[in-house]
Structures are given as C-alpha cells and as structure tokens.
C-alpha cells in the first residue's frame, strides 16, 4: 500500500506541474487550490514505525499527524505567501476567497470567526490557539463550546437550507 501511495503521489505531482505550467502562460488571473481530503491508506505498521510506538499507545497529537494532509494555493499572479500553515480543510475555502480578493459571504464570515479561536478541527478533535489538540467535550472553554455548537448548527443549515433564509435569520452581520 505504501509503494502504491507513493506512486500515485508522483502521478499527482506530475499532473499538478502540468496544470501549473499551463496556467503560468495564461493572461486570465487564475488561482488553483490542491489538497488531499483524507490521509493516505497506508499500513498501520508504517505509522507505528514512523512514530516509534504501537497505535494503541498513540495520543491525540499522534493520531492527528496521521490525518494531516498537505495543501497548496498557487496563482499566476502575486499572492501572499505562507508556509507551514496548520488549518483544517473547512477553512481552505476562506483562505482561497481571501487570496482572490473576494468578500466573504455570510456563511464564510462565521467560519472566519470560528477559525480565530479554533485554527483546525476534524472528526477526532480540534486544535487550540497554542497548537494543542483536544478531544471534543474535554474541558472546552465556553467560547470554544459555543463556537463549535453554533458551527454545527450553521453547517447543517448551510447544506440543508437551499435558499439560505434560515441562515440569514440566525446570523445577522453588520
């Protein structure tokens, strides 16, 4: 599985390079965001060797390392550079919109607010502003608890409220 993953990664890298070279030559301003939406399906033994311990002994920090996926935002014009950014996939849309100079829609404004206190989250937990991972429900501050609760409601509304009227009523922005 590891060899297969590395071979597929090489093919993806080559395809991305081809795409970038094409758009480098285009006059129309273009931004490309490429990311993996999940960790690779590699043998647990590989990760155990990498981390130096059995999976049953992993803490939340080590579990999160298995779910980390790289991303890149590239443009054929100058954009702000950032390296070694730790965010979750749900925040990439905002990063992309801001790089493109697009005003954040209502939904994204709340996502931006959440990201200021919770820079990363996934099915396993969330990262605080100090880069420490926490399980959901483990001694969350009232602020974090409220943000997560409202985010859950908003996310449900975003995907189920086709004309977004409920969201507009719930979240009034100035």
Stretches found by the model and what they are:
Residues 1-174:
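Solvent-exposed soluble domains appended to multi-pass membrane proteins
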